[in-house]
Every structure is written in structure tokens, then in C-alpha cells.
Amino acid sequence: MKRIAVDTAKLERSYGIIFMGRDSRAHMFYGSPEQMAFDAQPGLVTTQNAGILSLFTTYVEPEVIEILVRPTKAAELYGETKKGTWVSDTIAFIQAERTGSVSSYGDFSNDAMSDANIDFPQRQSYHYQTNTRWGEREIARAAEAKVDLANWKQRSSALAIEKYQNYAYLYGINGLQNYGGTNDPFLPAPIAPTLNWFQQTDPTAIFGDVLRIVQQAIAQGNGLVDTNTRFRMGMSPGNQSNFSKTNQFNYNVNDQIKKNFPNLTIVTVPEFAINGGGGVAGGTEFVQLIAEIPEGGKTVEAAFTEKMRAHAMVVKSSSWEQKKSAGTWGVVFYRPVLVAAMLG
């Protein structure tokens, strides 16, 4: 009987298998009536109650369900690098342009001259911060629920900095020479699509717009760009799904891109769906094509002074505080002429 009780208890605890009535004896009765009390029913001293505290019947799942946030993809599209330090306010780039002309030769002629023009375009940094604080009692209370509150607050501060860095990479900082990948004033104006990709069922028509934006980059490149150039195309995840539309001939845009532009890779950027994206009324889509040419170095880079600086922990009487900071230069386009875009 003892062995059966052990086995059934393990089945219930580990596997949720319950055998009711495994003990045939009724525990509320005794062996003989003489062992039972026949006293009169007493009155209650306590408040009448037929239940128990709800906490005894509440099961708390130990796994913490983290709320998901939109991914940060700007650094993947533009590339990312560190420039300067957290005390750097301005960054200057050295830009050299070769100039020259020729004339007909003459033994005593000094006509025509070759020269070089040196320029120093600049960008300004922007530094931002967030603070975290922990109380002794709040941490202890959270620990009763098996929640590591201190760790979650640290992760929140890191995420806040990462999200803002991504925002700065896309839109820059208003009032500073600090531009984003979508609004740098030196970028060529975007072209408009010929149709709404979400409403179009013919993949050949969608590929026609893809071809147009590649041709725009080729035209701007003035011979530096061709169909074999290494491209990165940024678009929203919803817009990318239009490339999977297939007709009765098993033709889709993804296959045509691989065939015609073998070095083109797609990076999805959620923020490129403007006002809900092209799939909703009033929404638009932004598509950006970046050409990288080996002889020209990098076309664009997202730059930061520091990804995150964790400042000293401040100890209070019964709490702690910590500041975290970071700095950004936004996105720097070294050769904006190699960037084409489509908006609509």
C-alpha cells in the first residue's frame, strides 16, 4: 500500500496523472461508534467561511514572458563603426577632388593646369542618456515572485539606448549637422513607383519597378555601377513579401533578382513602412538601394562615439542609481550619388 501511494504521488507531481479513490478507507470515520464524539453542535467563534485564500489555488508560471519590440535594423543596412570618443563634438572628413585640363602642346606654352581641391565636410555628435534605479524593498518583493527585477531594469536601459541609436541612424538629430539614412540633404531625390506593389498580382510589374531603381543607381553612378555591382536594398518586411508573388509560370521577383542582380541582398527595415505601409490606406513605402564599389571604399556608414557607457553606481541609503549614456553621429554618406531610393 505504501509503494502504491509513493508511485501515484510521483505520477501526480511529475506527469499530472491522478488516480482518485486509491485508498478505500474513508478517513472521516473511525473503527467503531464508541470512538466518535456525540457532542452538541457548538456555535462559531470565527467568521463563517467556506473557502480559502485564492493565492493557494494560483499557479505562477516561472518562465518570464518578455514583451517583444520591433527589431533595430538600421546598422545592418548601413554598416556601423566607431568614430571619436564621448568628448568629440565635431568630426571632420577630408575630401579630395582631382581637377585638371589639357591644351594643345607648345614648346613655350604654359596653358592648362592640373590641381586638387581639398574640402573638410563636418558632422556633429549627439549624446543622450537614461537612468536606472533600484530599491532594496522593491527588489526583495520582486524576488518573492521569482523575478530578477534588477536584471530586467538593466536590460531595459540597454534596449532604450539601442532603440534611440537606431532612430538616430534613420532620422538624424534635428537642429544639428547629424543626418539619418532617410533624410540626408545630400541624397538624390527618390523616384516614385509606377504602381502599388500590395495591390499588384503580376510579379513582372513589381520587378519592373525594381529594375527602375537599379537603373536609377546605374545612371547616377555615371559608369561606376552596373548590374553586377554589390547592392544592399532596404525595404519593410511587408513590402519584401510582395517579391514572393508568383504567377502561373512559376515566376516571382525573388528569382528574377537572383538571376539579374546576383550581388543584391535585401535588408528589412520596419521603419520603411510609413504610416502603416503600402498595404493600408494613406500608407507609403520607402525603398533604398545602396551600391558598393570596390575601388571607391564605403558608400555609407552609421557612426557612434560610444555604444554605451555605464557610469558609476550611486549607492543611496536603501537604493541604487546608475546612468547610462551613448553618442551618435547619425549616418554618414561618403558617396550619396551611389544611393537610389523609391518612395510611394
Residue locations for each model-derived region?
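Alpha-helical scaffold segments that mediate packing/assembly in large oligomeric complexes
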Residues: 129-212
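Helix N-cap / beta->alpha transition motif
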Residues: 135, 234-238, 335
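Assembly/oligomerization interface modules of large self-assembling protein complexes
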Residues: 46-130
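Short, flexible beta-strand-to-coil junctions
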Residues: 70, 74, 95-98, 226-229, ...
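Sequence/fold signature of self-assembling virion shell proteins
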Residues: 1-74, 244-344
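Extended, solvent-exposed, turn-rich assembly/linker loops in the middle of proteins
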Residues: 182-253
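Residue-level signal for secondary-structure boundary elements
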Residues: 165, 169, 222-226, 265-269
